[in-house]
């Protein structure tokens, strides 16, 4: 049977109760003037999320169809047809 006091020393693990400065830092977060750090961290996360959304939008696939611009022989102007609709029209006619 091992001694419990020597087991902690043998493994090198210590309890967090032995480090009072950690709990003091967490409890005195507002007193240390760290409120600005929380706000800055929130803004950094928002900027990262905004950049991720912009990069995903730029990497989006282009549309399947491309617009077709047709100039009619009677010269009544330029007509823009969507390629996909034009393809369906040509299949049905």
Curated annotation (Swiss-Prot):
Subcellular location: Host nucleus membrane
Transmembrane regions listed in the UniProt entry: 34-55
UniProt topology in membrane: Single-pass membrane protein
Cited Pfam families: Hum_adeno_E3A (PF05393)
Keyword Transmembrane in record: yes
Keyword Nucleus: no
UniProt keyword terms in alphabetical order: Early protein, Glycoprotein, Host membrane, Host nucleus, Membrane, Transmembrane, Transmembrane helix
Glycosylated residue positions: 3
Intrachain S-S bonds: none
Post-translational modification summary for this protein: N-glycosylated and probably also O-glycosylated.
GO CC terms in record: host cell nuclear membrane; membrane
Entry similarity comment: Belongs to the adenoviridae E3A-1 family.
Name of the protein this chain belongs to: Early E3A 10.5 kDa glycoprotein
Species of the source: Human adenovirus C serotype 5 (HAdV-5)
Source lineage: Viruses, Varidnaviria, Bamfordvirae, Preplasmiviricota, Tectiliviricetes
